Amino acid sequence: MAISAAQVKELRERTGAGMMDCKKALEETNGDMELAIDNMRKSGAAKAAKKAGNIAADGTILIKNGEGFAVLLEVNCQTDFVAKDANFLGFANAVLDVAAASKVSLEDLKAQFEEARVALVAKIGENINVRRVEYIDGTQLASYRHGERIGVVVTGEADEETLKHLAMHVAASKPEYVNPEDVPADVVAREQALQIEISMNEGKPAEIAEKMVVGRMKKFTGEISLTGQAYIMEPKKTVGEFLKEKGAKVTNFIRLEVGEGIEKKEEDFAAEVAAQIAASKKA
């Protein structure tokens, strides 16, 4: 039975699959549209399972306010092209809406959207992963997104503009803690041991080495804490000094960046082509 272009078009619109996949599915079912859809759904799930081994290190960070809190969500894909795709973003925003409605756990979000995720993987041909969801409580909240890849929410006692600027600062400067005294004792101890060893290797007298370590530790805790950093809007002041002048306070922040901690697989072009050829021979 000859398959018409109209049939292929209809199947593409109903499944979102590629033209050649649609044509092949219709040929295998002698033009039976519903059977072709069923078969593609089955094979799509199989394709999704194969894609699960691929590294999803691209994607988007989304932010939404709930009742007295905000939610930050990271959903990953494999390429920046898919990260801008309407189907991918629609899926990510659907997950975000559910999270913002009632602080749903990551495990429950994954379970609730697994069927939709598998269907999306089959449709776009990339691994998709709902990777992280973070909630931050506060009555005064300000958020900032830098493109699609970085999202920040800051809460505290300050006007909206101040908190917004501080969220921009957090996006750019990547502090890990609010205040120097918030740096965990084990982090401080590890850095202090390192600085002592460095000072000893430099051959400094004990008294001078001790002062050097104190100074270096102050610099270390300042650089990784928000209030100890130089404020990007007024670099001659620390964020702490700026907040004191404003009579303001930051109580918490969360910063997420797409792909943090994911080791992205690097392949040269020749290897990539060879892999595609090998895959086509197996198909």
From Swiss-Prot:
InterPro entries xrefs: EF-Ts_dimer_sf, Transl_elong_EFTs/EF1B, Transl_elong_EFTs/EF1B_dimer, Transl_elong_Ts_CS, UBA-like_sf
Gene3D superfamilies cross-referenced by the UniProt entry: 1.10.286.20, DNA helicase RuvA subunit, C-terminal domain (1.10.8.10), Elongation factor Ts, dimerisation domain (3.30.479.20)
Coiled coil: none
GO molecular function, one term: translation elongation factor activity
PROSITE patterns: EF_TS_1, EF_TS_2
Keyword presence, Signal: no
CDD domains per the UniProt record, alphabetical: UBA_EF-Ts
Main location group: cytoplasm
GO cellular component terms, A-Z: cytoplasm
Region (Involved in Mg(2+) ion dislocation from EF-Tu): 79-82
Annotated keywords: Cytoplasm, Elongation factor, Protein biosynthesis
Localization terms from the record: Cytoplasm
Role according to the record: Associates with the EF-Tu.GDP complex and induces the exchange of GDP to GTP. It remains bound to the aminoacyl-tRNA.EF-Tu.GTP complex up to the GTP hydrolysis stage on the ribosome.
Family that this chain belongs to: Belongs to the EF-Ts family.
NCBIfam families: tsf (TIGR00116)
Name of the protein in question: Elongation factor Ts
Organism this protein belongs to: Shewanella sp. (strain ANA-3)
